[in-house]
């Protein structure tokens, strides 16, 4: 019976600590941070899977599906390629003297004039596209002894045969085609683009019928360059009723230079020049519709917002656009490390601090206090720590955008079949650049995320240290982000701790007195198990001694007989 009494005493003593915490002479103050039930997973330098309370997506992965016509001037090419509009194909006359920021070529575009090729198609297309205008100035070339304004049934302008409006097809006059030698100086202060051509007849008969000579020659030169083209006579696949071809060439004449044209046949002469302007106009192949809206960034898929630093829509862009990366998602942490709140905390539902878990429900603040005292429980935010963290995180997204947004366009690059190896090299270089940028983007975001998490953890620790320095010996660090305050601390007292006006000297004597009284009977949780086990072992030992003594007493009285057989 004595053993049972002793065990009951120790058990009650072990539990007395829990109940003593609710004593009116003490209080508990816990520090915590914001938490959400379901956070967002982000990457850091040290961890690929870390949960935060909030994060912002940095990769734009979808377009509007339409091209916005503001603030950029968009010219819809409709049925005309840029080169057809440049040459003056009859069905492209509407584009004469047009200007643009972005010329949109459609997959439905077609040529509807004499079949031609441009040996340096990509360069001419890029040159005209970047110039941003089809402004054309007619000049008075003098072509003596030849017939001008040749036409073809393959190039109808209305019911009659026609030709490219910016070119002049010269043929024999009567039975002669004299040697032509024409000069045209550039007396202006800008570059001039002259477009000209050479006709390749399908047969020798066609050659002599048009130009008399069995073989023609065209030479176009300036002080800086010279091009000599000899026609290639021969049959080619029929296109719009023609097996002959025209090759289109171009020459840029600088201010103060002179254009010289020399030919004895097969010349497709220029009628004037195009003004070359330097700018950031461009061209893009796209079938996206053009709509009235505003967007700084345009891709072949349509316009996209540029409020993110990266995009995964298309590597061809125009305008101020996010940098293209391979990743479909990169999340920037804009909140702290998330530790979801535990819903059950044992029999007594004690409050807990940030080391155990976060607190849900702190919508307006990231850091705060919870307390338990004689007046009940409560919670309040710490605006100072919250604002300190937010100030450092705000602007992080804008800084990333400033570092990565391209203020120029990434144009399409085209090469002829002869330049296939250059095309392969260009593709390799572009792929390498994309790989490098994708890696840099992931590294940049991981670094920023690491900084954000370290920053928010640091602010939590600063708040804890600030509180600990205020309380000093009046409270004890419970090791879970909480303090046990050894004096009566009502709501006004708790508020003074939160706002930094707490005076520990006022409560020092009461706290020391209560600490000694409580410590006199308080058993630390670390010793409870030891005492219980020692009590149990002692009880068992005493029980065995009593049982052994009883057996020996009974044997002496003869009440118990023990026989040992060998």
From Swiss-Prot:
What is the topology of this protein in the membrane according to its UniProt annotation? Single-pass type I membrane protein
How is this chain modified after translation?
Answer: Palmitoylated.
Q: Does the keyword section mention Transmembrane helix?
A: yes
Show which residues constitute the signal peptide.
1-16
Ranges annotated as spanning the membrane: 531-551
Cellular component, GO, one term = membrane
- What positions does the record give for glycosylation? 23-24, 38, 54, 181, 301, 499
Key words, A-Z:
Clathrin- and caveolin-independent endocytosis of virus by host, Clathrin-mediated endocytosis of virus by host, Disulfide bond, Fusion of virus membrane with host endosomal membrane, Fusion of virus membrane with host membrane, Glycoprotein, Hemagglutinin, Host cell membrane, Host membrane, Host-virus interaction, Lipoprotein, Membrane, Palmitate, Signal, Transmembrane, Transmembrane helix, Viral attachment to host cell, Viral envelope protein, Viral penetration into host cytoplasm, Virion, Virus endocytosis by host, Virus entry into host cell
Annotated GO molecular function terms are: host cell surface receptor binding
Q: GO annotations under biological process?
A: clathrin-dependent endocytosis of virus by host cell; fusion of virus membrane with host endosome membrane; fusion of virus membrane with host plasma membrane; viral budding from plasma membrane; virion attachment to host cell
Report the SS bond pairs: 30-482, 68-293, 80-92, 113-155, 297-321, 489-493
Q: Answer whether the UniProt record assigns the keyword Acetylation to this protein.
A: no
Q: Which residue intervals are topologically Extracellular?
A: 17-530
Cytoplasmic side stretches:
552-566
Site annotation (Cleavage) points to 345-346
Lipidation, S-palmitoyl cysteine type: 555, 562, 565
Q: Where in the cell is it found?
A: Virion membrane; Host apical cell membrane
- What other note does the entry give for this protein? Major glycoprotein, comprises over 80% of the envelope proteins present in virus particle.
Subunit comment for this entry?
A: Homotrimer of disulfide-linked HA1-HA2.
Job description of the protein: Binds to sialic acid-containing receptors on the cell surface, bringing about the attachment of the virus particle to the cell. This attachment induces virion internalization of about two third of the virus particles through clathrin-dependent endocytosis and about one third through a clathrin- and caveolin-independent pathway. Plays a major role in the determination of host range restriction and virulence. Class I viral fusion protein.
Q: What is stated as this protein's family in its record?
A: Belongs to the influenza viruses hemagglutinin family.
Please report the name of this protein according to its UniProt entry.
Answer: Hemagglutinin
Instruction: Cite the source lineage.
Output: Viruses, Riboviria, Orthornavirae, Negarnaviricota, Polyploviricotina
